[in-house]
Amino acid sequence: MEELRGYLEIDRPHQQRFLYPLLFQESIYALAHNHGLNGSILYEPMEDLGHDKKSSSLNVKRLIIQMYQQNHFIISFNDSNQNRFLGHSRNSYFQMVSEGFAVIVEIPFSMRLVSSLEKGSESHNFQSIHSIFPFLEDKLSYLNYVLDILIPHPIHLEILVQSLRQWIRDLPSLHLLRFFLHEHQNWNSFITTNTKKCSSFFSRENQRLFLFLYNFHVYQFESLFVFLRKQFFHLRSISFGSFLERTHFYGKIENFVVSMRNHSQNILWLFKDLFMHYVRYKGKSIMASRGTYLLMNKWKSHLVNFWQFRFYFWSQPGRIHINELSNHSFYFPGYLSGLRLNPSMVRSEMLENSFMIDAVIKRFDTVVPTIFLIGSLAKVKLCNVSGHPISKSVWADSSDSDILDQFGRICRNLSHYHSGSYKKHSLCRIKYILRLSCARTLARKHKSTVRAILKRLGSEFLDEFLTEEQEILSLIFPKTPFHSGRIWYLDIIRIHSLANH
């Protein structure tokens, strides 16, 4: 790591032009396989892949030469059964080089992020997903309309390569990136309009590289809001370019290349809104404003045109929905959120006269999406589409303790994430489904009945589904029922797969 940092510190003005030689340094591949950097991305053990033999610069050079020389219409890297390279499958070598290449292309953006954090101490980086909701709770109560946006991602990858040229001027690296994109078996999935096929594009083998490309695409999309904000508020910008799974609220850009400045001065007056707020998680974002419906409709029209002329991508206007906050709930992320109107009567007395005043208080409300959660449980075969619990036959061969641990972990994760809901009674149904599904799985394993399993396990069975916050809150607030409290945790950096249906 120190060697890599030293290389980058030698000549900062020219470092973007010499990324390609880094591909032949073995320290890059050791960095790529560092689990601390890759987070939840799973990789095969080093001993299974023969990492010491594979990551030599000679092997990498031979692989890249063959990539340039091969006939793309005859040979495919993804045919691991027929194509072998030095005793290993081509696919494993392709995976190894793509991992190293992903680290290399992140370097210019990571260096900007580090330099920005050193210069600006007021930049906030909230890692917890739950930190989004206190922000919404403080802001949305005073706003009127919300734009529910699905960010268009099925664009042609050549557009991403062209966009990267603004930041990376190393042409060999960009050419190599094109080879990676054409060689990948799911290359066409990214340019299709089928969302389910697009999700398969981020494969296990090349997840880091394509996650980088997707985040860069979203970064280009969000640059519009930064540009407009700078025009009105004249704030000094700082960098933003982290490609890990984090949540950034106050990310701004330094040295942003504005390609539309000459054409935007005539339309900026349409979007001057001091109360516009923007929040995004993954491919979904919301824009809330205190303005009128006409203003929000202008924003919608401009976003569609921006996607078309900036990314050469035709986006249907139906991907953006305008809704009034007081009459609409939006799904973001893992919650059904909206504004609840609480009417109240206030009595005011003045001398001998008294007045009754009707007051309405807006409160940001978060509800557990029971239907979505049941659909997620049905997908993993824990219940049917009606919510009726069924046994998990795949886990029937595991030990009793492993089965209890699996179901208990799912229950605790869902309860932990949805602890911010005002009413948690709907979670009781989800816990009931998980408990009964667990009991049926154990009964299937032992060829017994659910009643016999519950009688044999007793309190041990229920303890597996008791969450920590229930125990802690009962001690801190003994008079406050757990279902009426709302807690936001600052240690949640990702949504459980069942919660993010």
UniProtKB/Swiss-Prot annotation:
Keyword Plastid among UniProt keywords: yes
Keywords noted in UniProt: Chloroplast, mRNA processing, Plastid, RNA-binding, tRNA processing
Localization annotation: Plastid, Chloroplast
Any GO BP annotation: tRNA processing
GO molecular function, one term: RNA binding
Organism this protein belongs to: Amborella trichopoda
Gene (name only): matK
Superkingdom of the source species: Eukaryota
Family from the record: Belongs to the intron maturase 2 family. MatK subfamily.
Entries under PANTHER family matching the protein: MATURASE K
InterPro entries reported for this sequence: Domain_X (IPR024937), Maturase_MatK (IPR002866), Maturase_MatK_N (IPR024942)
Protein's name according to its UniProt entry: Maturase K
Annotated function: Usually encoded in the trnK tRNA gene intron. Probably assists in splicing its own and other chloroplast group II introns.
GO cellular component, one term: chloroplast
Transmembrane stretches, start-end: none
